[in-house]
Each structure stands twice: as C-alpha cells, then as structure tokens.
C-alpha cells in the first residue's frame, strides 16, 4: 500500500441519441480506483462537443445538475486521473479536446509516454501551442498533425502509434467515430463490450463494463486499433511487430479491481495465488491472517487457505477517503492513514498476526499500519508482501519515479523489518511473478530494471513540468 495508478478511460458510441453522459458517469464510478485527482466527460452531439471536467472524485465533480447540462448524444468519452506527467491542475483534466482543420476530437489516455518531451519539442518548433503539461495533449497534437496528411482519423492514429514510445491505452472521439487503441506492448489494459441496445463501450477494466450492463467481448490486443462508427466496429490490428506482450504485472497485484479480468486472467485469482505462494515461501506460527484493505485482502485469503491459519478482518477501511497511494503530498498521506484504517481490537489483541499487503514503497504507510496493530495489542506481526521489492522507477504510468524514495534501494529486508517494527518480513520472489498470471508476458521493470522500451536519460514524472517551467524564466 502506498502506490497509485495513473488513469482510467471509458467511451461509448450509439446509433441514436441517448443520455451517453450518464452511462459514462457510471463507468467512471467503477474506475474511480484508477485515479482520484480529477475526472471529466466530453459528449459529442452531432459534431458539437460539450464537456465538464474538474478536480475531485466522480461524485464531487458530477452532480445531478452538472450531468443535466451535458446533452444527449451518440458518443462520449470519460476519464479519471492521477497525474503521472503534469501537475494537479484543472488544465490537465481529461479528456483533452483539440480543434483542427478537419474537425474536432477529444482524447482520454491511460499510461505514460517515455518520449513525450521529445515529441513536444518538435511540435512546439513547428508552431504548436500547448495549454497543459499533460502528455495526453502531446498525443492529441500528434494525431491532429497526422490527420492533416491522412484520409481518415484511424489512419492518423495508426501513424501516431509509430511515433509514440511508452504506455498508452486511449479512447478518442471525433466528429463521426470512436477510436480505441492499445500500445504494442499492451502495458495498460483496455477492453470493449456491447450493451443490449447495440451501444459499444470501451473501458480500462471489465468491471466498468459490468457497471453499465454491457457484455464483455474481449480485451484489445497489444498494438490493436478498434474503429467504431454508426455502422459498427472494425479492428485494425497492427503495430505489433515482434514485440512480446508486456502487461504491467502490478495491474494484477494492486491497480485493478479484483472483479476485473485482464487479458483472460482474473485479478482476484492472481492475488489468491500470490498469497498462496507467500505461505509456501514464508511459513510462520501465527494466530490470524489479516489483509490490508483493499488490495491485500485477496492475497491474505490465499495465505490463510494455504497455511491453515484463520483469516480475520482486522482492519476496517473508511470507504469515504481516497487511496493513500493517490495522495500526492506526503503529509496528506500520513494524515489519511490515521483516519483511513481502524483496527478491530478483539481480532488483534494478544495475537500473532500475519499482515498481508501488496507493496512497500517508501515505508511511510506500512509503519503507520504496524503501529495501529501494535497499539491494538498485536503480540507479533509478520508482514508478507505480495510483490517483490520496488528497486527502479516506472516510466509507463505508475507513480514510482525515483530510487531515492524507494526504501528497498537503501535497506535490506531485515533492516526494513526493523524500521517498520515487524517481527519478520517477506516479499514475493520475482521469479514467481509469472505464476500469478500463468504467463511470462508481463512488465516488471519496477522490480528488475528491465525496461521494454528506450528510456530517455533523466526522465522523471516531474521533469515534464519542470522543463516547461524553466523555459518560461
């Protein structure tokens, strides 16, 4: 606990006018776990684009009144955001809208470009004027430039994919089409389904399809472009080359909702397997197994089932406060832990506790949780982590941007155990990650430093905005 996801996207196209904004609203609600800084919806009503975007949760930004001001339409795209490039400002709220000579479009993007600065430099030299510090605007401008030289919006997206490096799962709405695209490595999830009235929907996770009553069809393949219009859907599978699929393994460990299925793998089942492996790797005599809500619960259940130690609900989560991993400020993170989790004393008092969590990044949150359990009377605490230690930055859309902030880069497992105040500490072995999804097709660069794409020197989350600020001085 202590990391955050980047974004969630949702799109819909229908053959006749309907309240598409309301459907996107429910879809974004189901994706709220993927981003809690801001959200937005853009509706296309016969070529007229109307949007509502702001900082805050879906429930805060979209009221009955604000939704009523969004028109009925045939297409809409929505987004929930945690900023992995660019700051937390209203300008960076998505979807990003762009006008061009051949029309207008709105783009929502999940992921992170590793060559965003290089692309932005070239665009600015050619006269582009940027209004945000988000790499999504860079994607939108590249598509716009390519659109002026191609016969269709899908051709423009195809050409753009040849220029982008890094992670992107995106949904684009133009005047007449909805486009969905997933990068050639498939770093971030993207799937689509269909509603009973024939509407097609696209979402970051299958749980969002279920939320709006859509039937899941399948995940987009790495490098695939789907084109939706009033006649239906056409797949343009390209840009795959010889690349091996590299879906982020942390989607399964932490980011995704447990009721989602990504690339035919149940997130819930993968977390159960992680807990079982931890029980095999690090057996211990204990009285109760407790998971840290929410993403540690399934792994805790797997550990309990495999070890035979009873499973207990020892931590209660306040559902009305955001994930600590999604709190950009360290002070906010500390304050939120104190009010977010509450120990169940009769489950913990006098017990030897196995505590299961999904990760340790800085150690800040973990220390607070251990203190909660100690104060509730835990006699022993044996911490088990359903991921390997974080040792490297992520450049593909996760907020792990500096080794200096990663506790495992500077301390051994035994030292970390002492710093956290636990009796023992064990991480999932990196060699076991493939067992979670029964495949070796995943990205684990934050654990092993093996980046599937070229990474520009000194690329950081804050470099994008810092460089832009330096230019203005």
Q: Model-predicted segments: where are they?
A:
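Secondary-structure transition/capping motifs at alpha-helix termini
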Residues: 128, 149-150, 283-287, 305-312, ...
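Conserved short alpha-helical segments that host acidic/polar catalytic motifs at enzyme active sites
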Residues: 1-222, 227-286, 292, 380, ...
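Generic beta-strand/beta-sheet core signal
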Residues: 108, 173, 181-182, 193, ...
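Phosphate/diphosphate-binding loops
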Residues: 159, 207-208, 215-216, 220-224, ...
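Flexible loop/turn segments at secondary-structure boundaries
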Residues: 84-85, 115, 187-188, 209-210, ...
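Short, glycine/charge-rich flexible loops or terminal/linker lids adjacent to PRPP-binding catalytic cores
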Residues: 308-353, 364, 391-397, 401
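A conserved beta-strand->alpha-helix junction
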Residues: 132, 137-141, 311-322, 419-437
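PRPP-dependent phosphoribosyltransferase catalytic core
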Residues: 161, 176, 213-219, 371-473
């Amino acid at each position: 606990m202590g990391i955050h996801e980047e974004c969630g996207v949702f799109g819909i196209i229908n053959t006749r006018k309907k309240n598409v904004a309301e459907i996107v609203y429910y879809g974004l609600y189901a994706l709220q776990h993927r981003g809690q800084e801001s959200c937005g919806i853009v509706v296309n009503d016969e070529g007229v684009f109307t949007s509502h975007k702001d900082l805050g949760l879906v429930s805060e930004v979209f009221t009955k009144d604000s939704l009523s001001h969004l028109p009925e339409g045939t297409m809409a795209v929505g987004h929930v955001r945690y900023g992995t490039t660019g700051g937390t400002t209203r300008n960076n709220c998505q979807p990003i809208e762009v006008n061009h000579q051949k029309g207008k479009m709105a783009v929502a993007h999940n992921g992170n470009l590793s060559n965003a600065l290089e692309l932005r430099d070239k665009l600015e030299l050619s006269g582009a004027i940027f209004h945000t510090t988000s790499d999504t605007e860079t994607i939108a401008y590249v598509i716009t430039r390519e659109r002026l030289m191609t016969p269709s919006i899908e051709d423009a997206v195809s050409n753009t994919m040849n220029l982008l490096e890094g992670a992107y799962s995106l949904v684009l709405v133009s005047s007449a089409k909805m486009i969905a695209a997933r990068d050639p490595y498939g770093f971030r999830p993207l799937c689509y389904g269909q509603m009973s009235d024939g509407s097609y929907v696209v979402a970051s996770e299958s749980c969002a399809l279920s939320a709006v009553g859509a039937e899941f069809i399948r995940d987009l393949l790495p490098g695939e472009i789907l084109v939706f219009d009033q006649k239906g859907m056409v797949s343009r599978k390209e840009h795959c080359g010889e690349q091996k699929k590299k879906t982020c393994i942390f989607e399964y460990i932490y980011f995704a909702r447990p009721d989602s299925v990504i690339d035919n793998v149940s997130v819930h089942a993968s977390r159960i397997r992680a807990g079982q492996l931890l029980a095999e790797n690090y057996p211990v005599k204990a009285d109760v197994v407790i998971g840290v809500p929410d993403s540690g619960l399934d792994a805790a259940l797997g550990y309990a089932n495999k070890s035979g130690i009873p499973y207990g609900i020892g931590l209660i989560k306040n559902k009305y406060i955001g994930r600590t991993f999604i709190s950009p400020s360290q002070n906010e993170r500390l304050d939120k832990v104190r009010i977010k989790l509450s120990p169940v004393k009769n489950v913990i008092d006098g017990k030897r506790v196995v505590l299961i969590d999904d990760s340790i990044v800085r150690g800040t949150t973990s220390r607070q949780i251990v203190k909660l359990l100690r104060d509730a009377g835990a006699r022993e605490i044996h911490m088990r982590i359903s991921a390997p230690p974080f040792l490297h930055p992520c450049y593909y859309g996760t907020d792990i941007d500096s080794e200096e902030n990663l506790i495992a880069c500077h301390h051994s497992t035994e030292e970390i155990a002492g710093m956290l105040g636990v009796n023992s500490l064990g991480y999932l072995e990196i060699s076991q990650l493939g067992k979670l999804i029964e495949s070796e097709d995943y990205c684990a660069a934050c654990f092993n430093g093996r980046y599937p794409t070229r990474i520009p020197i000194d690329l950081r989350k804050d470099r994008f905005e810092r460089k832009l600020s330096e230019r203005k001085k």
